[in-house]
Amino acid sequence: DQICIGYHANNSKKQIDTIMEKNVTVTHAQDILEKKHNGKLCSLKGVKPLILKDCSVAGLVLGNPMCDDFLNAPEWSYIVEKNNPINGLCYPGDFNDYEELKHLVSSTNLFEKIRIIPRNSWTNHDASSGVSSACPHLGRSSFFRNVVWLIKKNNVYPTIKRTYNNTNVEDLLILWGIHHPNDAAEQAKLYQNLNAYVSVTSTLNQRSIPKIATRPKVNGQSGRMEFFWTILRPNDTISFESTGNFIAPEYAYKIVKKGDSAIMRSELEYGNCDTKCQTPLVAINSSMPFHNVHPLTIGECPKYVKSDKLVLATGMRNVPQKKKRGLFGAIAGFIEGGWQGMVDGWYGYHHINGQGSGYAADKKSTQKAIDGITNKVNSIIDKMNTQFEAVGREFNNLERRIENLNKNLEDGFIDVWTYNAELLVLMENERTLDLHDSNVKNLYDKVRLQLRDNAKEWGNGCFEFYHKCDNECMESVRNGTYNYPKYSEESKLKRKEIDGIKWESMGTYQILSIYSTVASSLALAIMVAGLSFWMCSNGSLQCRICI
């Protein structure tokens, strides 16, 4: 009768890497690197993105006439801006601290537009003629919706003095501007005053003077406009004073809801889908801790790494035995590979006795290993799968060195994460395979310590009993209740019987060996004597006897 200790094997082709080996085939493995995506821009946790189409953030906040679709934008999860939107500053010019403004917008989920200085309140100035063919709407000249371009009235431009107090509980985003004419004639035509200025006082003090200069035409305009913005806190006051060239605020934005928004560069349209993680190119819905789809993300995202493969071993080495061995399908132990016939556990036994043969998994050690490995995998995923965002940052032309430094830092972080992820997987895979080897060895030692000299170790993971071991006996070995004294006498007799056969065989071999040696020597002596007699008789050999 025989019992073997072994482990599960299957038809799996999954391969993992360890510190010491590459492409190790295992019975079970779990991929922790997400490579799949849906190729769409999606809502983020049920909230749609604000896709600006051909508009820029500047066109959105100033109210470019071509961006009327976004005049009252609902709450958004993130903003999508094309790489080169055509509807931004329709009247050529510049937006002061534009990158900071985009950063502010990217951390906001909802604006509410309110009127702070009504257009019809400018009774001493022309508030309707300030339009341009550069900002058309329905084929007619128009202007930005949220500001008013004030012109002289009746050849007079009285000094403007306006104050606004923020009585709201929210912060206010306020925008204004200054016009830089092409020449003095245009300055006089529009504002009458040649030495004009625009002064703004709030938490900052700013005084701007028109820069009159000849410039090339852009969008049909030789003049330029410069726009500014500020955040007005609750109960704070902003004051405007101007003698010309003033582009006054009509509307401001209450920052109703701040949050984890972002501005993404993408040419995609809305894909009518929902996701937890969005990149500029695709959406990712995954519970894996790592991904290699795109480095820029928003939402609850896996961490981006440059790896192509991150697979955690959860099972053991998959080395199925080539074929059954011996009579009645005898099978070897774990030294010679795993068992595909054992399907209800990772480790277990195969026995052969007078009642038949069969497999039995050791469910206790299997469950303990499963629990340990499952907890380890879940722990890795939980620790790595925290909310992680990596959004692009905006820099102006004077900040290219900072932008390059920032890019190098981000690339360095990605390299570190990639190295850490790959090293983590290699180390954990090594530990997992060692754990399985240790569990099989522990099972083997458990049997060996019970059987002691009641069975013979074959050295391949199997034991041959010196006594009869029925199914009840086999079960006692498996569950650790084997009664060694009960079978020791029978085993002792069996060992003596085997030893006696050995000694008897050894004695027979010695007698045969002696007989063979004597017979060979006698035959050789007779042959030598006969040869000598023949040679003496024909004179070939002379024999002398001396006394």
From Swiss-Prot:
Q: How does it assemble?
A: Homotrimer of disulfide-linked HA1-HA2.
Q: Check the record and name the Gene3D superfamilies matching this protein.
A: 3.90.20.10, 3.90.209.20
Q: Which GO terms describe its cellular component?
A: host cell plasma membrane; membrane; viral envelope; virion membrane
Query: Which residues carry attached sugars according to the database record?
Result: 10, 23, 165, 235, 285, 479
Q: Which residues cross the membrane?
A: 511-531
| Keyword list, A-Z | Clathrin- and caveolin-independent endocytosis of virus by host, Clathrin-mediated endocytosis of virus by host, Disulfide bond, Fusion of virus membrane with host endosomal membrane, Fusion of virus membrane with host membrane, Glycoprotein, Hemagglutinin, Host cell membrane, Host membrane, Host-virus interaction, Lipoprotein, Membrane, Palmitate, Transmembrane, Transmembrane helix, Viral attachment to host cell, Viral envelope protein, Viral penetration into host cytoplasm, Virion, Virus endocytosis by host, Virus entry into host cell
What protein name is recorded for this chain? Hemagglutinin
| Similarity annotation | Belongs to the influenza viruses hemagglutinin family.
Task: Cite the ranges annotated as topological domain Cytoplasmic.
Answer: 532-547
Q: How is it modified after translation?
A: Palmitoylated.
| Organism encoding this protein | Influenza A virus (strain A/Chicken/Pennsylvania/1370/1983 H5N2)
The record's disulfide annotation reads: 4-462, 42-273, 55-67, 90-135, 277-301, 469-473
Give the organism's phylogenetic lineage: Viruses, Riboviria, Orthornavirae, Negarnaviricota, Polyploviricotina
The record makes one more remark, namely: Major glycoprotein, comprises over 80% of the envelope proteins present in virus particle.
Q: Which SUPFAM superfamilies match?
A: Influenza hemagglutinin (stalk), Viral protein domain
Location within or outside the cell: Virion membrane; Host apical cell membrane
User: Known InterPro entries for this protein?
Assistant: Capsid_hemagglutn (IPR008980), Hemagglutn_HA1_a/b_dom_sf (IPR013828), Hemagglutn_influenz_A (IPR000149), Hemagglutn_influenz_A/B (IPR001364)
Where does lipidation (S-palmitoyl cysteine) occur on this chain?
A: 536, 543, 546
Citing just one GO molecular function, the answer is:
host cell surface receptor binding
User: What is known about what this protein does?
Assistant: Binds to sialic acid-containing receptors on the cell surface, bringing about the attachment of the virus particle to the cell. This attachment induces virion internalization either through clathrin-dependent endocytosis or through clathrin- and caveolin-independent pathway. Plays a major role in the determination of host range restriction and virulence. Class I viral fusion protein. Responsible for penetration of the virus into the cell cytoplasm by mediating the fusion of the membrane of the endocytosed virus particle with the endosomal membrane.
Matching entries from Pfam families are given as: Hemagglutinin (PF00509)
User: How the protein sits in the membrane?
Assistant: Single-pass type I membrane protein
Instruction: Please list the GO biological process terms of this entry.
Output: clathrin-dependent endocytosis of virus by host cell; fusion of virus membrane with host endosome membrane; fusion of virus membrane with host plasma membrane; virion attachment to host cell
Site annotation Cleavage: residues: 325-326
Extracellular topological intervals = 1-510
